[in-house]
């Protein structure tokens, strides 16, 4: 496995691979890898001849007062996990190369970025789509893999790819959870032991909603109250949003069906966690 930091070098490798008829898969990450990331890499290996994982804590998707400076970083461990998962190249560019002093071009998906995480994180998705578009141009992947834990992000990237006619197949992969149900996240490392227990209110409330839905409840108001009641019992939990949305276009819904996605953002102590559940999926 190689570590590439130079953009020009990465582009040259990708162009040569394509010229030789190789399929390229890309797994974009911000590092501090866990088994959720590894699952994307294992799937990427099945779908391509050259598997590239990017590791880049992207400054343009963090807002003022967010955790860019404190975001966990561990390149040595990341390289171990990536290599074990079958990654051929790690692309870890420097921020100064990705965004030089005279940088002024951004990609913005308009409507899908307004609700959910976009409502309280202005500019976040503009940063996400810009860096992903840059990675697509640099790595030239045939396929790119993203986790469904960031459900809105996946929808936004799919919209960007469709709107801009990017020749990339975007694959969404299921959420990988800890044994007790907590969705794997690099930010879980911020949690104290007590907060780690409290954080289970996210997955537990999603499971409760799924159970109620399977028993016939279709009222979004009733299902939402179930989530709110469960999370509000945790003293260190502060709800950012609890939303029921159409699974494809993220439009708000009043009546739940199998395509409805329940999306949560909750602060546990100082740590903002997200999770989601599509009601029609096991």
From Swiss-Prot:
CDD domains: PanC. Keywords: ATP-binding, Cytoplasm, Ligase, Nucleotide-binding, Pantothenate biosynthesis. InterPro entries: Pantoate_ligase, Pantoate_ligase_C, Rossmann-like_a/b/a_fold. It comes from the Bacteria. ATP binds at residues 30-37, 147-150, 176, 184-187. One of its GO terms (biological process) is pantothenate biosynthetic process. The active site is at 37 (proton donor). Pathway: Cofactor biosynthesis; (R)-pantothenate biosynthesis; (R)-pantothenate from (R)-pantoate and beta-alanine: step 1/1. It is an enzyme of class 6 (ligase). The keyword Repressor does not apply. (R)-pantoate binds at residues 61, 153. Belongs to the pantothenate synthetase family. This is Pantothenate synthetase. It comes from Geotalea daltonii (strain DSM 22248 / JCM 15807 / FRC-32).
């Amino acid at each position: 496995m190689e570590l590439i930091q130079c953009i020009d070098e990465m582009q040259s490798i990708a162009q040569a691979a394509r010229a030789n008829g190789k399929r390229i898969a890309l797994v974009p990450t911000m590092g501090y890898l866990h088994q959720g990331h590894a699952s994307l890499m294992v799937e990427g290996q099945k779908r391509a001849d050259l598997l590239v994982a990017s590791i880049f804590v992207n400054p343009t998707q963090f807002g003022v007062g967010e955790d860019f400076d404190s975001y966990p970083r561990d390149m040595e461990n990341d390289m171990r996990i990536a290599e074990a998962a079958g990654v051929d190249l790690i692309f870890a560019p420097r921020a100064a190369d990705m965004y030089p002093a005279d940088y002024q071009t951004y990609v913005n998906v308009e409507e899908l970025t307004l609700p959910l995480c976009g409502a309280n994180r202005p500019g976040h998705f503009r940063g996400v789509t810009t860096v992903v578009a840059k990675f697509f141009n640099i790595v030239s992947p045939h396929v790119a893999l993203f986790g469904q834990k960031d459900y809105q992000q996946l929808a936004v990237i799919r919209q960007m790819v469709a709107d801009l006619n990017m020749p990339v197949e975007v694959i969404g992969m299921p959420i990988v959870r800890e044994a007790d149900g907590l969705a794997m996240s690099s930010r879980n490392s911020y949690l104290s032991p007590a907060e780690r227990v409290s954080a289970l209110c996210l997955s537990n409330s999603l499971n409760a909603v799924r159970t109620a839905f399977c028993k016939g409840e279709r009222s979004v108001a009733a299902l939402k109250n179930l989530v709110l009641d469960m999370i509000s019992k945790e003293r260190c939990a502060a709800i950012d949003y609890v939303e029921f949305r159409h699974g494809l276009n993220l439009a708000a819904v009043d009546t739940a069906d199998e395509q409805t996605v329940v999306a949560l953002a909750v602060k546990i102590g100082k740590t903002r966690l997200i999770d989601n559940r599509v009601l029609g999926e096991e």
